[in-house]
Amino acid sequence: MSAAILSMLGRQSAQPWANGSLLVIHPGGGELSALPNASAWSFHAGHAAYWKAAGRPVFCQIQPPNLSHYDGVLFLVAKEKELNQYLLEQLASLPTGTPVWFAGEKRSGIQPLMKHLPAWLQPPQKLASANHCLLFASERNEQVHQSASIEDYAKNITYELNQQQESFVTLPGVFSREHIDPATLLLLQHIKDLPKGRGMDFACGAGVIAKQLASVATELMACDVSPIAIAASEITLANEPVKTELRLADGIPDNAGQFDFIVSNPPFHTGQRTDYEIAREFISNARQHLNKQGVFRVVANRFLPWPEVIESVFGNCSVIADDGRYRVYHATCR
């Protein structure tokens, strides 16, 4: 969660969300775990870990916890519009009269979201505006509505790879929601020479890369920080001949074991900000999980400083593809 939102909430003379049992939706970090009687419904394993460390209840999963257990909800608006719509759908399960507070940065899209709240929520009232952030209040009314499931938001995306039609299933809040991204497509054109053996798709998203790795791997693990991504990958990989172990983790799982290759289109964004530490930590940890002569292969924007980082960690780094915007980097664990 941004410091601006936290500051806005902290400056309110009246903080009704601090009274009674509160569910914080999409917390974006652990800052609000200090609120009395607060629980979190999170979509990021790293953020969930902050709440666990603070000894607070946290649910890092697609489905909401039992909403009847809470006296109020604090909804932190996500930058992904469809994810917000899915989360709003789940609020239909709230008991009538339950207050809902919405907080978010203006650039996250909170204003248009407030203009189009579903009919089962009362028209929102603006409580505060500060530091380019907004705070609104609403509540569940008596209108009956059956919440849509996450499966109702699934999209089947098709694309062409090596003159073959391929597909994957994606869900709200997962990278590459509308189409395959060009960086991933470039990477997929350079995986057939990977060594046979146990492989990993790090930051697997909707399982696009893992699905293609199934043709070269004898055993496969795919991990992601998002439970929604794990659910999308599960659908995408359901009928593949090589069973993939899906892991929800912030980084490479500690007990992941050793691999013959690790492949990724690693993320470098946290919310709306660039965060290079995600990829730096991944590159460092990847070497520890590779067997001798194991292969490390990633795709990234050309402007990112990964060749130097990969070289410093592995002692070697080569470019095996470059389309002018993205490069595929290759290193061997020696």
From Swiss-Prot:
InterPro entries, per database record: DNA_methylase_N6_adenine_CS, Mtase_sm_N, rRNA_ssu_MeTfrase_C, RsmC/RlmG, SAM-dependent_MTases_sf, Small_mtfrase_dom
Gene Ontology MF terms: 16S rRNA (guanine(1207)-N(2))-methyltransferase activity; nucleic acid binding
Catalytic activity: guanosine(1207) in 16S rRNA + S-adenosyl-L-methionine = N(2)-methylguanosine(1207) in 16S rRNA + S-adenosyl-L-homocysteine + H(+)
Top-level taxonomic group: Bacteria
UniProt keyword list: Cytoplasm, Methyltransferase, rRNA processing, S-adenosyl-L-methionine, Transferase
Top EC class for this record: transferase
Location relative to the cell: Cytoplasm
Gene3D superfamilies per UniProt: Vaccinia Virus protein VP39
GO cellular component assignments: cytoplasm
Main location as per UniProt: cytoplasm
Keyword Protein biosynthesis in annotation: no
Pfam families attached to this UniProt entry: MTS (PF05175), MTS_N (PF08468)
EC number in record: 2.1.1.172
Subunit structure of this chain's protein: Monomer.
Chain's role: Specifically methylates the guanine in position 1207 of 16S rRNA in the 30S particle.
Stated family: Belongs to the methyltransferase superfamily. RsmC family.
Record protein name field: Ribosomal RNA small subunit methyltransferase C
Organism: Idiomarina loihiensis (strain ATCC BAA-735 / DSM 15497 / L2-TR)
Gene: rsmC
